[in-house]
A protein has these predicted regions:
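ACP-dependent fatty acid/polyketide chain-elongation machinery
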Residues: 1-65, 242-254, 349-363, 407-411
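Phosphate/pyrophosphate-binding loops at sites that engage ATP/ADP/AMP, CoA/4′-phosphopantetheine
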Residues: 83-95, 244-250, 281-297, 319-323
Length: 411
């Protein structure tokens, strides 16, 4: 199988636009939570979200293109262009049919549907925006990135709820391994902080109703109360190793393993024994030929819901046994909230930066251990540690599990 490396990364997040800004804020435990500004939450139980600040689509594409994209697509294009530039790709020197795209969104645009429903109620169905459907559907993130950058290879839209970003990167990795592409832009995007989105997740009792930004998102903590909705995008450039070497690209890391399973258990809850997530992690390690004792760090799904954090902890213990207590496990969602379809992609980027810098970020806000959840969740200010590998987990509604293993590039 062909080897696959990372040569570019881009991010739009609640704590910074651009990977460098995002990463500096992660290291400082900057919190991205605040009062929802997109709509009036007076009648809602939830008033806090992790919104992207100071973003304007026209800064990343021409005004006409931006007008024909919903926010989730604009975020994806912005992140993709950053990754594309860092990778130093020149499409005039590439076969465009060998450069593809695997960018998913868990939801697409609820806002486009909201607007259409209001229009029908107020003025009738004939007044709906002719572009309503292409504005709304989730595959348009991959479509618009391909259009903006001239990518004519395989174009995928993975939709696996909260595991979308990780599956998107994993499937891009597979595409390059198997020879379907030489380069893939891969990741996830989401922008669902809107009346229907917040109401829906609130009705599920999945969201924290805590209004204190310092206490609303507490992954693995005894006082956790649900996740905080976030938004943004993460996109990476994956590339076949020899292709990257031939064009003199700077290699940031290598992707060496990918595991994907289904719990076949429940539409929202992970399997209570963690068996599905454990198997996904095991598959990623087995593909890479990495022994369990060689892995010292996991970037967990860590949503701060009661079920996820407990069952994910069980999954880690199930696979690693006593070695689980030697590892460090953290949650980036403690700072940016849950980016839904973009979560796994932004957390993949976090893993690459942690390996590059030799620094494992803290789980912000973690202070009070819970029964049975007794692993090292990285309290305090983070730790300096030379990492050879980082494993990123994502668990999505419907029982979708994905794990992807990143290796330090030192050749």
């Amino acid at each position: 199988m062909r080897r696959v490396v990372v040569t570019g990364m881009g991010a739009v997040t609640p704590i910074g636009i651009g990977v460098d800004t995002f990463w500096e804020n992660v290291k400082k435990k900057t919190l991205g939570f605040g009062e929802i500004t997109r709509f009036d939450t007076t009648d809602y139980k939830v008033h806090i979200a992790a919104e992207v600040k100071d973003f304007a689509g026209k800064d990343y594409m021409d005004f006409k293109a931006a007008k024909r994209m919903e926010l989730f697509c604009q975020y994806a294009v912005a992140a993709a262009k950053e990754a594309f530039v860092q990778a130093g790709l020149d499409m005039e020197k590439e076969d465009p049919f060998r450069v593809g795209c695997s960018i998913g969104s868990g939801i697409g645009s609820l806002q486009a549907a909201e607007t259409a429903c209001h229009k029908i109620a107020e003025k009738g169905p004939s007044r709906v925006n002719p572009l309503m459907v292409p504005l709304m559907i989730s595959n348009m993130a991959a479509g618009n990135v391909s259009i903006q950058l001239g990518l004519k290879g395989k174009s995928l839209n993975v939709v696996t709820a909260c595991a979308t970003g990780t599956h998107s990167i994993g499937e891009a990795y597979r595409s390059i391994q198997c020879g379907d592409a030489d380069v893939m832009l891969a990741g996830g995007t989401e922008a669902s902080i809107c009346p229907v989105g917040v109401a829906g997740f609130t009705a599920l009792t999945a969201l924290s109703t805590v209004d204190d930004p310092e206490k609303c998102s507490l992954p693995f903590d005894k006082n956790r109360s649900g996740f905080v909705m976030g938004e943004g995008s993460g996109v990476v450039v994956l590339e076949e190793l020899e292709h990257a070497r031939q064009r003199g690209a700077k290699i940031l890391a290598e992707v060496v393993g990918y595991g994907a399973t289904s719990d076949a258990y429940h539409i929202t809850s992970p399997a209570e024994d963690g068996s599905g997530a454990a198997k996904a992690m095991e598959l990623a390690l087995e593909e890479a030929g990495v022994k369990k004792e060689e892995l010292m760090y996991i970037n967990a799904h860590g949503t701060a819901t009661h079920h996820n954090d407990l069952f994910e902890t069980r999954a880690i213990k199930k696979l690693f046994g006593e070695h689980a207590y030697e590892m460090k496990v953290n949650s980036t969602k403690s700072m940016v909230g849950h980016l839904l379809g973009a979560a796994g992609a932004v957390e993949f980027i976090t893993c690459v930066k942690e390996i590059e810098d030799g620094f494992i970020h803290a789980t912000a806000g973690y202070t009070t251990p819970d029964e049975e959840m007794d692993l090292n969740y990285v309290a305090g200010d983070g730790v300096e540690e030379n990492l050879e590998y980082a494993l990123s987990n994502s668990l999505g509604f419907g029982g979708h599990n994905a794990s992807i293993l990143v290796k330090k590039w030192d050749i």
